[in-house]
């Protein structure tokens, strides 16, 4: 199976994409940025491959930000949104229905809008509301444009003084992504490539991806979406500690089936709470006999953002190799476009 949209090339360009998007956001005149002293809360508005940039920033900087941050994936903004709200709206295409609806809702309530897109309707909505628009580096599929959206979010928060560590974290992340690309790029064959080897081990089993804490939860969900969209295969995700209060009860009832079908993938990072590390070990003892195999991916790099993006990047590469080894083209997402066309026909 060929890569008809050169999706692997887009994946390989992530480190440079992150740098270019940072430069674009850094060039915005400081006077155009919202004033930090006027902000009491932050909302991240976005869906899919664009919206997850908000999840990334929330997970990476929630411990540093002096105001609460909420990620929204719906049609309207909640009642607390108002003039003291910093509303980031992310849509790579600029035309995502739900993001446009939430942005209009936030604008109606007087929120301070910062939109990030390649133009489109979102740019017009933001500017009409007196907000700021930051242009993304063009030419990527939205799910391969995570750097084009994460970097402006981090850069704006840094320049506003809300996330003083964000600029250094971006640099650390870019360094680690380049290092990971050297390990996982298409020129590295066989078991020497950790993403190819992981895809080989997964084979045609169904991935069950577990992470720990905020970083692990976002990474696990991104992996799930990567397998869904790139490999066109089912996958499921959950996170510690929540899964130990519900999902753990599901294992064993159909153990003979899950032992054939499910591969548990543990996403580990250096910022796990000590109790979460114990939960990984204790829960694995229960689940191990109920799944085909247990695999682990360890985050590398410095800083919360760097380790989160590193885990996500491993998911990008692994899902693409999983697609190709199963004769699936990783680029096209026909089901999503068919649904969008159907929705456009409805009132």
Language model regions located:
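Catalytic cores of large soluble enzymes that bind and process phosphate-bearing ligands
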Residues: 3-6, 10, 49, 53, ...
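Active-site phosphate/pyrophosphate-binding segments
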Residues: 3-13, 20-32, 37-40, 158-261, ...
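Short, small/acidic-rich helices and loops at N termini and domain boundaries
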Residues: 331-347
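C-terminal active-site/capping subdomain that shapes the small-molecule cofactor and substrate pocket
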Residues: 249-334
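Glycine-rich phosphate-binding loops that contact phosphosugars or nucleotide phosphates
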Residues: 37-180, 200, 269-293
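A generic structural motif
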Residues: 71-74, 233-244, 293-302
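A residue-level signal for conserved active-site and pocket-lining positions in enzyme catalytic cores
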Residues: 18, 153, 318
């Amino acid at each position: 199976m060929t890569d008809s949209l050169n999706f692997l090339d887009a994946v390989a360009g992530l480190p440079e994409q992150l740098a270019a998007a940072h430069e674009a956001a850094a060039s915005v005149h400081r006077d155009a940025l919202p004033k930090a002293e006027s902000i009491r809360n932050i909302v991240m508005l976005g869906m899919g491959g664009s919206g997850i940039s908000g999840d990334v920033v929330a997970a990476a900087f929630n411990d540093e930000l002096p105001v609460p941050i909420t990620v929204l994936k719906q049609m309207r903004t909640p009642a607390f949104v108002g003039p003291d709200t910093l509303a980031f709206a992310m849509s790579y295409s600029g035309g995502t229905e739900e993001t446009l609806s939430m942005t209009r809702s936030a604008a109606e309530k007087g929120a301070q809008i910062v939109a990030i897109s390649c133009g489109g309707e979102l740019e017009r909505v933001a500017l009409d509301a007196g907000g700021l628009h930051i242009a993304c580096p063009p030419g990527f599929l939205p799910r391969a444009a995570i750097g084009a959206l994460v970097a402006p979010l981090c850069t704006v928060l840094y320049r506003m003084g809300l996330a003083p560590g964000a600029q250094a974290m971006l640099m650390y992340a870019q360094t680690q992504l380049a290092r990971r690309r050297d390990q996982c790029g298409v020129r590295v064959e066989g078991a020497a490539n950790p993403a190819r080897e992981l895809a080989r081990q997964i084979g045609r089993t169904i991935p069950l991806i577990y992470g720990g804490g905020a970083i692990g939860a976002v990474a696990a969900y991104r992996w799930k979406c990567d397998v869904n969209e790139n490999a066109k295969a089912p996958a499921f995700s959950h996170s510690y500690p929540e899964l130990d209060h519900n999902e753990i009860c599901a294992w064993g009832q159909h153990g003979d089936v899950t032992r054939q079908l499910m591969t548990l993938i543990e996403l580990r990072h250096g910022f796990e709470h000590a109790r979460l590390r114990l939960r990984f070990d204790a829960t694995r003892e229960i689940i191990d006999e109920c799944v085909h195999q247990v695999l682990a991916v360890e985050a590398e790099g410095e800083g919360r953002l760097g380790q989160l993006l590193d885990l996500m990047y491993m998911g990008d590469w692994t899902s693409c190799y999983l697609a190709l080894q199963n004769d699936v083209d990783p680029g096209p997402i026909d089901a999503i476009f068919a649904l969008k066309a159907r929705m456009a026909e409805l009132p």
